[in-house]
């Protein structure tokens, strides 16, 4: 076929045959606060077009609250509000070590998630029916994962991202991290939240805090490996007081396509750890 012989009428005829407006979609990217009001007023054949919203990773979300001016709100403001809500910076800094244990059920098996933290080292263990399934240890120097008898050191770019969250209460470390940014407000499960984000080389984490209580209600961790993002979500609720510090007694955590509901069963402040706890 000779493309020079194609006429405007030919293009219109083919378009009318193969392009059905009822199945059409318009994809718009950009700064939402500058676009949304204009998009809401788009009228086609006497009807306003329906609008769907997606996050940076293509996941469908509720309509975010978009404002041009957040009155000077910063990531540091949000973090400080959270730290004050759970006990206050002075109280939190008096805790040098901590052990936290959650229990839940998945696929007919009992699941235990246990965290042991020092200021410069963290151990996360997952047990299924009493058997250790996975353990990850992160320090300032390295990070590794153990599964059964196998131990694998994580690459430097993984470690660089993971060590950003070191500390008994990681938000204290994040206060002075120049890479964490306030990205706006959203609605999560009918709750208005502040969103802050830490974008890493491999692992990026989005933290969501209740605007009014200051408490953290959700974390979304996205790991990008070879162009394939893996998303893990954790929800937090029903905070309880342990010696003057609030901890979420309910935690929902994604495990593959499933979500595990977990309950807080133990919190120990300033325990003594052995070297084995971090090996």
Predicted regions: what is each one?
Residues 6, 11, 21-24, 34, ...:
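Extracytoplasmic
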Residues 70-77, 84, 140-204, 211, ...:
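Flexible, processing/modification-adjacent segments and terminal tails
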Residues 1-95:
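Mature, solvent-exposed C-terminal subdomains and processed small-chain segments of exported/organellar
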Residues 132, 191-278:
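Gly/Pro-enriched, hydrophobic low-complexity segments
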Residues 14-17, 113-116, 246:
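Short, surface-exposed beta-strand/loop micro-motifs that present aromatic residues
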Residues 29-33, 44, 56, 105, ...:
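Solvent-exposed coil/turn segments that connect beta secondary-structure elements
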Residues 76-150, 176-182, 187:
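N-terminal mature ectodomain segment of secretory-pathway/periplasmic proteins
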